[in-house]
Amino acid sequence: MTDCLLRIEELSVAFHTPEGTARAVDRVSFSLKRGETLGVVGESGCGKSVTSLSILGLIPSPPGIIESGCIRFEDRNLLELDPEALRRLRGHDISMIFQEPMTSLNPVIAIGRQVAEPLMVHQGLSRSAALAQAGEWLDRVKIPAARRRLEDYPHQLSGGMRQRVMIAM
């Protein structure tokens, strides 16, 4: 097993629109070893989110397209994986904590169900087992009265608690 967990090489991403082509990411390269933390910082609109979404295979196509580069995770080129293999990888081996949880959480679904869903999909847990696990995860991220909060909706939580729900997921 390689020491390099994630390697991005010369990644370029563009969005083709009727008004022209917008180059969101231009030849970005970086690597991340196991146990390391990488902070991606920059001005608004510089490509941080597009880079992260590219790693997860979540660039909307069209209009977005990865024009060139390589994204390797544990020695697998993610750009060569079929959609099902990439879906299995997402949420189990690699994930993203979105910056604004209110736009990522579904406002009409209780948070317990939202935390439980990836557990059912990626670990094959039953609904009841996944909800029990969701309560444990909410407790681990220090949501007060975590098991009672399983039935709460995103708008009933503070911004910080919503962010912790995303971390639990």
What kind of feature is each model-predicted range?
Residues 1-169:
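ABC transporter nucleotide-binding domains
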